[in-house]
Structures are given as C-alpha cells and as structure tokens.
Amino acid sequence: MRTDKSFNDICYSCDETEDPMNREKRLFDDFSKKLTNISKKSKGWNDILQNVPLEEINKREDLSKLPITRKSNLSKIQKSFPLYGGLTIKDDKEFKYCFSSPGEIYEPGDSGDFWNMANCLYAAGMRKGDLVYNTFSYHLGPAGIMMSNAANEIGCSVIPGGVGNTDIQLEVLNYTKPSFYIGTPSFLKILL
C-alpha cells in the first residue's frame, strides 16, 4: 500500500486518487522494456510474443497489438510446459501456492496480497481490526486464500469458514459475531 499526504480514509492507496495523466504515464513508463524482459525470462511468453514488435508497445492504444491468450488454450499451453506453461518469470516451485481451476488450469499464488484484492475489500468498508468470515473454499482454487490474504493485508483477522458444515458454521458465526462476510450470495442465503 502506498501512502503519502493525499492518502485519506476513503482510499486504500494513493493510486486511486492519482491524476489520470500521471497514472497513465506511470503505468506505461518502460512498458516495452518490461515486456521484453518478461519475454526473455519466460519461455511461454517468448513463444506468444515472438511476432510482436515489443518496442512499439508504449501506450494504452498499443495493447491491441498484443495477442489474446484464451482460457481454452491455456490448458494446452500448460501441458506442453508444466506447471504454468512457462508463463511466469520465476521458477514454478518458488510460488507459495499452486491452485487448480476447472478445465485443468493451474495458477500460481504467493503470500501477501498477490492478487491486489485489498483495494476492493477496503472500498467495501473493511478496516484494520475487523473480524472477517471467509466462506470461499480453501480447497484447490484460489478464492479462499486470495480473500484471506487481502483481508490480512488490511489488518483484519480471518475466520476460514470455507463451505459446508452449515451447523458448525452457524455456531461459529453466533459466537464470534464477525463484522464482514466474504463468500457467495447463495451460501449466505443458506446461512441466513
């Protein structure tokens, strides 16, 4: 989280209130160099970007020059170069988590707010010291850990409820009285 004099209690990060022109400049400064670096360090991205003039990707409009990698192709790419299709710039075993998603797709995960979800939870009103009840699954998919890590980043304690065991979950909810629920609307309806 970046903080400076313009930081206020409404925004989690000063990036949210940054002048749009400054943000655009910051986002695209050295963008082509970053893409080139990723392409050099990642076999998967090197294959995908091999016919793209990376030095020409310097502003938002240039993003249309990049090929789209469809989710339906990701499984095939990953099978040809396990675990993550060569689409990371560090060794696959260096990540803290290896998630599996439907369609035989594997996703890396790391500690902290790896998915940058803290901004969303903060915008929803979550603050340091809140007790959060997280009913997203912690089994194979990333949602449970994704939300827990984001809430922890803000300074919240998390009850990792997951799904199922409704009777036990109701006991926990009644005893702990969390200030936030994270999960699907359908499971919330069951709990209510």
Q: Each PLM stretch: what is its role?
A:
Residues 15, 109-111, 136, 156-161:
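Short, flexible loop segments at the rims of nucleotide/cofactor-binding pockets, characterized by
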Residues 118, 122-158:
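Conserved AMP-binding loop of ANL adenylate-forming enzymes
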Residues 179-192:
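Adenylate-forming
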Residues 42-43, 163, 185-186:
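Alpha-helix N-cap/helix-start capping motif
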Residues 1-123, 127:
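Nucleotide 5′-phosphate-binding alpha/beta core
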Residues 158-173:
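ATP-dependent adenylate-forming carboxylate-activation enzymes
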Residues 176:
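Active-site charged/polar residues at nucleotide-handling catalytic sites that mediate phosphoryl
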Residues 116-120, 168, 187-190:
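Well-ordered alpha-helical segments embedded in enzymatic catalytic cores
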